[in-house]
Amino acid sequence: MGDMKYTELSDLYRRLEKTTLKTLKTKFVADFLKKTPDELLEVVPYLILGKVFPDWDERELGVGEKLLIKAVSMATGVQEREIENSVKDTGDLGESVALALKKKKQKSFFSQPLTIKRVYQTFIKIAEASGEGSQDRKLKYLANIFMDAQPEEGKYIARTVLGMMRTGVAEGILRDAIAEAFKVKAELVERAYMLTSDFGYVAKVAKLEGNDGLGKVHIQIGKPIRPMLAQNAASVKEALLEMGAEAAFEIKYDGARVQVHKDGDRVVIYSRRLENVTRSIPEVVDAIKASIKSEKAIVEGELVAVGEGGRPRPFQYVLRRFRRKYNIEEMIEKIPLELNLFDVLYVDGEPLIDTPFRERRAKLEEIVEEGEKLKLAQQLVTKKVEEAEEFYKKALELGHEGLMAKRLDSVYEPGNRGKKWLKIKPTMEDLDLVIIGAEWGEGRRAHLLGSFLVAAYDPHSGEFVPVGKVGSGFTDEDLVEFTKMLKPLIIGGEGKFVEIEPKVVIQVTYQEIQKSPKYRSGFALRFPRYVALREDKSPEEADTIERIAQLYEFQERFKAKK
């Protein structure tokens, strides 16, 4: 197997950290990919992103800050307390690991330079360590690589282990770098990634098979497809006009979107963010096995928490189920779930994403036998505004979010947010926004982050544009959790204000949207208030600046009618 020195990768991380220019980051990554041996190509793209495995891979390292500090102490002879104090001073565990490695008491006689292969194989051993004594084994594996690590290598190994890489490389840069490195079309790299969610696989195909190979990449059971997304419509009438003569209207459930992969008796369920949540919802797995008649299938649906009288409960209840790893039987009783299927993307060897929606729905009805916990999404196909309005009213009365409108001739476009699907919800709806900054509190809250700068997504520039500061709606427990979550994401700041890497999405309610010169978006939320953490959404799935402009227009029109 071809290999590379790990110091080459740590040097790449350092150079990526030193520039904010996307073009330069893309060039650095492309140059690195060019010299990566074929055998490492499926691994290196994830390491560049600061990950070990794809998001959909069930394996995780399961190493916290304390265990990592213990491993560094074992490797260097530096006391754990000294490393902990260093972390308080630097605010960066990676930097503190580098400082500890510089003070290493003795160097092993058998020490060898680290290679990417060795570091990655150690990560796999750590992830696969389980059962009695697993923590001790993880500690030993980590200490062994820290013993042979140079200070800068140790810094980035620590950041990778804790998921705290700060190089500013996201999916867009990696996509463009693969295209540049192997002289292939960026749109083909994008398509292949949208179909497989696997940059390692895509990079290898790009290098070995070029544009032809990328064009032949197809859906694979066990690798989630990026979900097709919807734009917003102001009303049922507007949606029907956009769709043409006739449209399919479906209830928009207030739940968590999931993608189900079935291969015989093997069922895997992925969340909207493509995380494997199968183990947390075994009763849903049983319902899928009982209801889906085809041997192999990929279907999509909305998982809803069911309350008294069958009414839906807020989506946060579903997320509580996803997070639960123990006492799952107890949670099945406390938070019963129902899966409402709305699409099918693959059946028994036949990909269906290029098949019109009308035919996909017919195929879904053909392969699904509804049960108590698994239903088909309620649907109305109509040309009449009045019928669709009545259906919308019924959806809201039942406690659902609104409606989805879908073009009957639309193909499934992975990862695309177009107008072939539209969502219709009450006008003054909450917004999903990204935290990009925060301020340290005062008095008894001086150690906690408090007021949060939130931003909408601008899909044209790929930037997050601020629209307000949210300081209310948080409990003390919330602030403790957010501080813990956001501290590793701090990338700069001045005084009490800190700049946060845009990773965390929150749901925000507000009194109204105002025009404002204060923010470059041109808008500001009046009296914004925190509602919930949106763990199911990636930053790019947050509400867009166009959506805020649209809501502002709705709001002003509504005021004018009064």
Swiss-Prot record:
Not stimulated by Ca(2+), Mn(2+) and Ni(2+). It holds the Pfam family DNA_ligase_A_N. Optimum temperature is 80 degrees Celsius. SUPFAM superfamilies: ATP-dependent DNA ligase DNA-binding domain, DNA ligase/mRNA capping enzyme, catalytic domain, Nucleic acid-binding proteins. Optimum pH is 7.5. ATP binds at E250, R257, R272, E302, F342, R417, K423. Keywords: ATP-binding, Cell cycle, Cell division, DNA damage, DNA recombination, DNA repair, DNA replication, Ligase, Magnesium, Metal-binding, NAD, Nucleotide-binding, Zinc. It catalyses: ATP + (deoxyribonucleotide)n-3'-hydroxyl + 5'-phospho-(deoxyribonucleotide)m = (deoxyribonucleotide)n+m + AMP + diphosphate; NAD(+) + (deoxyribonucleotide)n-3'-hydroxyl + 5'-phospho-(deoxyribonucleotide)m = (deoxyribonucleotide)n+m + AMP + beta-nicotinamide D-nucleotide. Its cofactor is Mg(2+); Zn(2+). GO terms for biological process: cell division; DNA biosynthetic process; DNA recombination; DNA repair; lagging strand elongation. The active site is at K252. Its EC number is 6.5.1.6. It comes from the Archaea. GO terms for molecular function: ATP binding; DNA binding; DNA ligase (ATP) activity; metal ion binding. Gene3D superfamilies: DNA ligase, ATP-dependent, N-terminal domain, DNA ligase/mRNA capping enzyme, Nucleic acid-binding proteins. NCBIfam families: dnl1. PANTHER family: DNA LIGASE, DNA LIGASE 1/3 FAMILY MEMBER. Belongs to the ATP-dependent DNA ligase family. DNA ligase that seals nicks in double-stranded DNA during DNA replication, DNA recombination and DNA repair. Can use both ATP and NAD(+), but NAD(+) may be a preferred nucleotide cofactor. This is DNA ligase. The gene is lig.
